[in-house]
Amino acid sequence: MTSPSAPLTGSIVALVTPMHDDGSVDYPALRKLIDWHIAEGTDCIGVVGTTGESPTVNVEEHCEIIRVSVEQAAKRVPIMAGCGANSTAEAIELARFAKKVGADSQLQVVPYYNKPTQEGQYRHFKAIAEAVGDLPMVLYNVPGRSVADMQHETVLRLTQVPGIVGIKEATGNIERAQWLIRDVPKGFAVYSGDDPTAVALMLCGGQGNISVTANVAPRLMHELCVAALAGDTRRAMEIQFRLMPVHKQLFVEANPIPVKWAVQRMGLCGGALRLPMTPLSQGNEAVVEAALRAAGLL
């Protein structure tokens, strides 16, 4: 489901990073997860993003996760490498590495904590694009986590920068997404970063969904995206209604706490997290399990 003018369309899993109980990255489990997603129909695998615990892996680990993912995917599906940082220099370093090892695109989040102005955001992303060259960049706007919010006008400025090909819009605000879809130039992709509103965004003209739920329901999310992108509202909403409890309960605590518990419960990989993330509370384990069962995933 690729396009010459954008990295991809369809279901992009925001993949968890498997870890051993001691907190070290479980690379064999990562390889198995990638194989499973390919078999289940995931259109693209996004690694080392928010769901992949990017804030708590060091640069060496970050690079190794990208390298292993690219190697294991072996061009069977594209790899979208999370390369975001609140230091422009570090983001460039990560993106250069991703390009060197063969990633298909990079995801660059709005710098968090240091709260750059709109001009600072523009210069940050422009500097990365100019430094890294032809590795397609997808912007990532998630003000609920980064605090800084990339405004509509800033996105439009960035659409004119060579190499910036899309945006993951994770506000869940469909009106805002519609304005973006209306105003961005042809060939610039708008992706949902919010599972509950992903169908609506795609039916409005968005190109896909960068999904947490796809960690536990990859085939269903792929089918949902196929239907929504084809304008088949009935089929898309049939799947969406089935997955709504999962969308909701995977955020009953901060992501990726619930989804890490869910993938362990499903036997896909271990559920260990790195501090300051802590395990899902016992009470919420039952809530997440009920959602998985309601969707037929257990």
Curated annotation (Swiss-Prot):
The keyword Amino-acid biosynthesis applies. Pyruvate binds at residues 51, 210. The active site is at 140 (proton donor/acceptor), 168 (schiff-base intermediate with substrate). Pathway: Amino-acid biosynthesis; L-lysine biosynthesis via DAP pathway; (S)-tetrahydrodipicolinate from L-aspartate: step 3/4. SUPFAM superfamilies: Aldolase (SSF51569). InterPro entries: Aldolase_TIM, DapA, DapA-like, Schiff_base-form_aldolases_AS. Transmembrane segments: none annotated. GO terms for molecular function: 4-hydroxy-tetrahydrodipicolinate synthase activity. Its main location: cytoplasm. CDD domains: DHDPS. GO terms for cellular component: cytosol. Keywords: Amino-acid biosynthesis, Cytoplasm, Diaminopimelate biosynthesis, Lyase, Lysine biosynthesis, Schiff base. One of its GO terms (biological process) is lysine biosynthetic process via diaminopimelate. PROSITE patterns: DHDPS_2. It catalyses: L-aspartate 4-semialdehyde + pyruvate = (2S,4S)-4-hydroxy-2,3,4,5-tetrahydrodipicolinate + H2O + H(+). It is found in: Cytoplasm. Its EC number is 4.3.3.7. The record marks 50, 113 as: Part of a proton relay during catalysis. Belongs to the DapA family. Homotetramer; dimer of dimers. PANTHER family: 4-HYDROXY-2-OXOGLUTARATE ALDOLASE, MITOCHONDRIAL (PTHR12128:SF66), DIHYDRODIPICOLINATE SYNTHASE (PTHR12128). This is 4-hydroxy-tetrahydrodipicolinate synthase. It comes from Acidovorax ebreus (strain TPSY) (Diaphorobacter sp. (strain TPSY)). The gene is dapA.
